[in-house]
Amino acid sequence: MIRATAMHRSIVQRRMLSTASRLQQAAKPATGSTVGTANGASAASGKPPGATFEGASKQKKKTHKFRNFVLLSTFVGAGAFAGGVYYSLQNDQFQSLFVEYVPAAEHAINYIEEQQLRSGRLKIATPTSKHDVDQSTVRVPKSGATWRAVDSTDAATSAKSASSPAANVAKDVASPAPAATASPVSSGSPKTDNTTVPAVRLANDSDPAVKAAVQTFNDLIAVAPSGAAKQLSAKVSTVVDQLQHNVAQIKSEAAEEAKNSINKLNSELAKLKASTGEEISSKVSAAEQQLRNEFAALRAHSEKVYHDRLRVEIEATKSLVSSHANNLIQAVEAERQKQYAQEIAERVETEREGRLSKLKDLQTSLTQLQDLALKTEQAVDASGRTAALHLAIAKLTGALKGSEPVALGPYVESIRRAAGDDPLLQAALDSIPEVAQTEGVLTPAQLTIRFKLLEPELRKSSLVPVNAGVAGHLGSLIFSSLLFKKSGVPKGDDVESVLARANIALEQGKLYDAVAEVNTLKGWPRKLASDWLDEGRRRTEIEFLADVIAEEGKLYGALSSKK
């Protein structure tokens, strides 16, 4: 059944396509004739043909091929369906084929027949020709009163030659025949009984089939003689009552059976809906729980990997700074001990030569020793400040690389205290916005998620004009769904190309390139992406300042050691 329905639909679609192509071919000559007429008119007016249609070509309206095709297909399909329903009402053989291969045909035919039956336009077929009347009429042999005596042998011969239904009716009707035939023989004069017998009456709400049968019996009573007609009328009334009772009983049984079938189908449909809904809800819940578990596991793994990497980098930085400071301290201490030993040796030598003569030299040496101790303390202090600066810069970098926005104010203050009077570091720290110091900045992952959420809205507004109204927005919403989504690194300034390049840049971790691509948008997409652009610019500015501070921090230790 499904295969036959699909074949019928394919045949109807091919017919509609062929009809549309024929209509287009028929419309082409008309178009050519119109163009020729216009060219002739332009030639008659002294203007070249191209000048005549130059403005018209610019104002050429859309052909709406898709809309015309849909309308034509709808009208052709509706006409074919209506014609099939009409012919099915006229031909039973075509009706069986039409109901079998066309969906919803049976419901339409049943509805039309029910409406015709209710309005009284659908009637039971009755014999319309003499041949049909002869075929549907039961022949009854002559009996009852007649103008001559009937021989018993002739009556028997005629009764035997009749068919079985006619013979049964003849037996019931011809039972009073002897008394009726005796009277004309005894009287000896032919008489005709012209007494009319009343016809069988029915109520107006009787079944049409019963009405047709009663009408046939009434015609038979009107034709039959009066004596037999009275008996036939009484029996027919009994038969009609029984027939009407049987028809009413059959109708009630059919209605009850139909009602039971409908209730059974409704209960089965309700059970099927309930079971299907429970199965679908259980599957959706299971799939949702599985996705949540996978996301939680992936998030935990990513956090663990990031924290491990951050801990290793911090430990490496601490060890590097500590080793560098220890090396400086040991070198200064060794130099001081060496100088102190040298001074002691010189002093001992001087004392040997004479204490009083060398007091001036001893004072000079002590002064130099004090200067050396002061320089050593300054070097140790600078080394401590350098280590503190490197540690504060590492904490700021770690906060920027975290998975959640963190207020940068404490890290900025720690770097400011460790930087001292360095003008470049102070300028870089002053350039950090107050919002970032109090609320922090969004992470690259958060910016990527926000861009994914913003991307459909940008695509919907990609076709909105600059000063568009409600119609422009609705048109952009509808036609933007027909655009193809680009991938890779396409060229061009259209919204799809810009979104594709921005997605690639975000996937590669190049936030600066993604912000630059989104910054090239214009119109409504630029307005919708303004908040995301502000967050992205703030993030890139903070990263740039953090890089400047880190590079200056590397040079800070070398400059301090030289001083």
From Swiss-Prot:
Belongs to the MICOS complex subunit Mic60 family. GO terms for biological process: cristae formation. This is MICOS complex subunit MIC60. It comes from the Eukaryota. Residues 90-563 are mitochondrial intermembrane. Keywords: Coiled coil, Membrane, Mitochondrion, Mitochondrion inner membrane, Transit peptide, Transmembrane, Transmembrane helix. It is found in: Mitochondrion inner membrane. Component of the mitochondrial contact site and cristae organizing system (MICOS) complex. Residues 18-68 are mitochondrial matrix. It is a single-pass membrane protein. Residues 1-17 form a transit peptide. One of its GO terms (cellular component) is MICOS complex. It holds the Pfam family Mitofilin. The chain crosses the membrane at residues 69-89. Residues 239-379 form a coiled coil. Residues 38-51, 149-170, 178-190 have a biased composition (Low complexity). Residues 23-59, 128-170, 178-197 are annotated as: Disordered. It comes from Yarrowia lipolytica (strain CLIB 122 / E 150). Component of the MICOS complex, a large protein complex of the mitochondrial inner membrane that plays crucial roles in the maintenance of crista junctions, inner membrane architecture, and formation of contact sites to the outer membrane. Plays a role in keeping cristae membranes connected to the inner boundary membrane. Also promotes protein import via the mitochondrial intermembrane space assembly (MIA) pathway. The gene is MIC60.
